[in-house]
Protein backbone atom coordinates (compact mmCIF):
# COMPACT_ATOMS: atom_id res chain seq x y z
CA UNK A 1 0.00 0.00 0.00
CA UNK A 2 1.24 3.51 -0.86
CA UNK A 3 0.41 6.65 1.14
CA UNK A 4 0.79 10.18 -0.24
CA UNK A 5 3.21 12.49 1.52
CA UNK A 6 1.71 15.81 2.65
CA UNK A 7 3.12 19.33 2.44
CA UNK A 8 6.21 20.19 0.43
CA UNK A 9 7.34 16.53 0.40
CA UNK A 10 6.05 15.31 -2.95
CA UNK A 11 5.74 11.60 -3.55
CA UNK A 12 4.50 8.51 -1.79
CA UNK A 13 5.66 6.12 0.90
CA UNK A 14 5.05 2.38 0.86
CA UNK A 15 3.57 0.87 4.02
CA UNK A 16 2.67 -2.64 5.11
CA UNK A 17 -0.88 -3.87 4.47
CA UNK A 18 -0.49 -6.00 7.61
CA UNK A 19 -0.44 -2.81 9.71
CA UNK A 20 -2.33 -0.21 7.64
CA UNK A 21 -4.65 -2.35 5.51
CA UNK A 22 -6.80 -4.19 8.06
CA UNK A 23 -10.60 -4.25 8.33
CA UNK A 24 -12.03 -2.07 11.10
CA UNK A 25 -12.99 -4.21 14.10
CA UNK A 26 -15.39 -1.92 15.96
CA UNK A 27 -16.16 -4.30 18.84
CA UNK A 28 -12.47 -4.92 19.55
CA UNK A 29 -11.62 -1.21 19.46
CA UNK A 30 -14.57 -0.49 21.77
CA UNK A 31 -13.37 -3.16 24.21
CA UNK A 32 -9.80 -1.81 24.29
CA UNK A 33 -10.90 1.83 24.66
CA UNK A 34 -13.36 0.88 27.43
CA UNK A 35 -10.59 -1.02 29.26
CA UNK A 36 -8.30 2.02 28.92
CA UNK A 37 -10.82 4.33 30.62
CA UNK A 38 -11.75 1.68 33.21
CA UNK A 39 -8.10 1.43 34.26
CA UNK A 40 -8.13 5.16 35.01
CA UNK A 41 -10.92 4.87 37.57
CA UNK A 42 -9.80 5.21 41.19
CA UNK A 43 -12.37 2.88 42.71
CA UNK A 44 -11.57 4.16 46.19
CA UNK A 45 -15.16 4.64 47.39
CA UNK A 46 -15.83 3.23 50.86
CA UNK A 47 -18.60 3.33 53.47
CA UNK A 48 -18.91 1.82 56.95
CA UNK A 49 -21.25 -0.93 58.08
CA UNK A 50 -22.81 -1.03 61.56
CA UNK A 51 -19.82 -2.99 62.84
CA UNK A 52 -17.29 -0.42 61.55
CA UNK A 53 -18.89 2.84 62.73
CA UNK A 54 -17.30 4.20 65.91
CA UNK A 55 -19.37 3.66 69.08
CA UNK A 56 -22.58 1.74 69.56
CA UNK A 57 -21.18 -0.88 71.90
CA UNK A 58 -23.66 -0.24 74.68
CA UNK A 59 -27.32 -1.25 74.44
CA UNK A 60 -29.27 2.08 74.46
CA UNK A 61 -31.99 0.86 76.84
CA UNK A 62 -33.11 -2.42 78.35
CA UNK A 63 -34.86 -5.00 76.18
CA UNK A 64 -38.27 -4.96 77.87
CA UNK A 65 -40.46 -2.72 79.96
CA UNK A 66 -39.79 0.71 78.43
CA UNK A 67 -42.61 0.66 75.87
CA UNK A 68 -40.13 1.56 73.14
CA UNK A 69 -39.01 -0.62 70.26
CA UNK A 70 -36.12 -2.90 71.16
CA UNK A 71 -32.66 -1.64 70.20
CA UNK A 72 -29.25 -3.23 70.57
CA UNK A 73 -26.97 -0.47 69.24
CA UNK A 74 -27.15 3.21 68.33
CA UNK A 75 -25.23 2.40 65.12
CA UNK A 76 -28.07 0.42 63.51
CA UNK A 77 -28.63 1.41 59.85
CA UNK A 78 -32.12 2.52 60.92
CA UNK A 79 -30.66 5.20 63.16
CA UNK A 80 -29.18 8.59 62.35
CA UNK A 81 -25.35 8.32 62.27
CA UNK A 82 -25.70 4.56 61.98
CA UNK A 83 -23.85 2.30 59.58
CA UNK A 84 -24.79 1.67 55.94
CA UNK A 85 -26.72 -1.52 55.20
CA UNK A 86 -24.89 -2.51 52.01
CA UNK A 87 -21.75 -0.42 52.37
CA UNK A 88 -19.75 0.41 49.25
CA UNK A 89 -16.31 -1.17 49.09
CA UNK A 90 -13.12 -0.22 47.20
CA UNK A 91 -13.29 -1.77 43.74
CA UNK A 92 -10.75 -2.56 41.04
CA UNK A 93 -12.24 -1.67 37.65
CA UNK A 94 -9.35 -2.85 35.47
CA UNK A 95 -10.22 -5.12 32.57
CA UNK A 96 -7.84 -7.62 31.02
CA UNK A 97 -6.65 -6.82 27.51
CA UNK A 98 -3.90 -9.10 26.27
CA UNK A 99 -1.11 -7.96 23.97
CA UNK A 100 -2.55 -9.64 20.89
CA UNK A 101 -5.88 -7.82 21.29
CA UNK A 102 -4.17 -4.46 21.93
CA UNK A 103 -2.00 -4.74 18.83
CA UNK A 104 -4.96 -5.82 16.70
CA UNK A 105 -6.93 -2.78 17.92
CA UNK A 106 -4.02 -0.46 17.07
CA UNK A 107 -3.75 -1.95 13.55
CA UNK A 108 -7.51 -1.62 13.12
CA UNK A 109 -7.48 2.06 14.16
CA UNK A 110 -4.48 2.96 11.97
CA UNK A 111 -6.12 1.25 8.97
CA UNK A 112 -9.37 3.14 9.56
CA UNK A 113 -7.47 6.44 9.81
CA UNK A 114 -5.98 5.71 6.37
CA UNK A 115 -9.42 4.87 4.91
CA UNK A 116 -10.97 8.06 6.33
CA UNK A 117 -7.99 10.13 5.09
CA UNK A 118 -7.31 11.27 8.66
CA UNK A 119 -3.69 10.03 8.65
CA UNK A 120 -1.36 12.77 7.37
CA UNK A 121 2.14 11.52 6.52
CA UNK A 122 5.17 13.82 6.30
CA UNK A 123 8.82 13.03 5.67
CA UNK A 124 9.84 14.88 8.85
CA UNK A 125 8.27 17.39 11.22
CA UNK A 126 10.23 19.68 13.53
CA UNK A 127 10.54 23.29 14.68
CA UNK A 128 13.69 25.41 14.99
CA UNK A 129 12.80 26.66 18.47
CA UNK A 130 10.16 25.83 21.10
CA UNK A 131 7.84 28.57 19.80
CA UNK A 132 4.08 28.09 19.57
CA UNK A 133 3.87 30.58 16.68
CA UNK A 134 6.22 28.45 14.55
CA UNK A 135 4.22 25.29 15.13
CA UNK A 136 0.88 27.00 14.43
CA UNK A 137 2.27 28.24 11.09
CA UNK A 138 3.53 24.76 10.14
CA UNK A 139 0.17 23.17 11.01
CA UNK A 140 -1.65 25.87 9.02
CA UNK A 141 0.48 25.04 5.96
CA UNK A 142 -0.79 21.46 6.24
CA UNK A 143 -4.37 22.66 6.86
CA UNK A 144 -4.40 21.08 10.32
CA UNK A 145 -6.12 22.45 13.42
CA UNK A 146 -6.94 19.61 15.84
CA UNK A 147 -4.15 17.09 15.42
CA UNK A 148 -2.11 14.46 17.20
CA UNK A 149 1.54 14.64 16.13
CA UNK A 150 3.33 11.28 16.30
CA UNK A 151 7.12 11.18 15.93
CA UNK A 152 9.61 8.34 16.27
CA UNK A 153 11.10 9.85 19.44
CA UNK A 154 9.94 12.79 21.54
CA UNK A 155 11.26 16.11 20.17
CA UNK A 156 11.51 18.45 23.17
CA UNK A 157 11.24 21.64 21.06
CA UNK A 158 8.13 20.32 19.33
CA UNK A 159 6.63 19.15 22.62
CA UNK A 160 7.15 22.56 24.28
CA UNK A 161 5.81 24.42 21.23
CA UNK A 162 2.59 22.36 21.29
CA UNK A 163 1.85 22.70 25.02
CA UNK A 164 -0.11 25.93 24.67
CA UNK A 165 -2.16 24.95 21.62
CA UNK A 166 -5.61 23.52 22.41
CA UNK A 167 -6.48 20.25 20.63
CA UNK A 168 -2.85 19.62 19.58
CA UNK A 169 -0.67 17.01 21.27
CA UNK A 170 2.77 15.53 20.59
CA UNK A 171 3.64 11.91 21.42
CA UNK A 172 6.21 9.39 20.32
CA UNK A 173 5.29 5.97 18.91
CA UNK A 174 5.72 4.29 22.30
CA UNK A 175 3.17 6.65 23.91
CA UNK A 176 0.59 6.51 21.10
CA UNK A 177 -2.43 4.55 22.32
CA UNK A 178 -5.88 3.69 20.89
CA UNK A 179 -7.63 6.50 22.79
CA UNK A 180 -5.28 9.27 21.61
CA UNK A 181 -5.44 8.00 18.00
CA UNK A 182 -9.26 8.12 17.86
CA UNK A 183 -9.61 11.36 19.86
CA UNK A 184 -8.18 13.76 17.27
CA UNK A 185 -9.57 14.87 13.91
CA UNK A 186 -6.23 14.20 12.19
CA UNK A 187 -3.09 12.25 13.08
CA UNK A 188 0.14 13.70 11.70
CA UNK A 189 2.83 11.04 11.54
CA UNK A 190 6.41 11.07 10.25
CA UNK A 191 7.78 8.38 7.93
CA UNK A 192 10.19 7.17 10.63
CA UNK A 193 7.24 6.84 13.03
CA UNK A 194 5.35 4.80 10.41
CA UNK A 195 8.28 2.40 10.21
CA UNK A 196 8.32 2.14 14.02
CA UNK A 197 4.57 1.33 14.01
CA UNK A 198 5.19 -1.41 11.44
CA UNK A 199 8.01 -2.84 13.55
CA UNK A 200 5.94 -2.66 16.74
CA UNK A 201 2.62 -3.97 15.37
CA UNK A 202 3.68 -6.14 12.43
Swiss-Prot record:
Gene3D superfamilies: 3.40.1370.10. SUPFAM superfamilies: Ribosomal protein L4. Residues 44-67 are annotated as: Disordered. One of its GO terms (biological process) is translation. InterPro entries: Ribosomal_uL4, Ribosomal_uL4-like, Ribosomal_uL4_dom_sf. One of its GO terms (cellular component) is ribosome. Keywords: Ribonucleoprotein, Ribosomal protein, RNA-binding, rRNA-binding. Residues 56-67 have a biased composition (Basic residues). GO terms for molecular function: rRNA binding; structural constituent of ribosome. HAMAP family: Ribosomal_uL4_B (MF_01328_B). Belongs to the universal ribosomal protein uL4 family. Part of the 50S ribosomal subunit. One of the primary rRNA binding proteins, this protein initially binds near the 5'-end of the 23S rRNA. It is important during the early stages of 50S assembly. It makes multiple contacts with different domains of the 23S rRNA in the assembled 50S subunit and ribosome. Forms part of the polypeptide exit tunnel. This is Large ribosomal subunit protein uL4. It comes from Chromohalobacter salexigens (strain ATCC BAA-138 / DSM 3043 / CIP 106854 / NCIMB 13768 / 1H11). The gene is rplD.
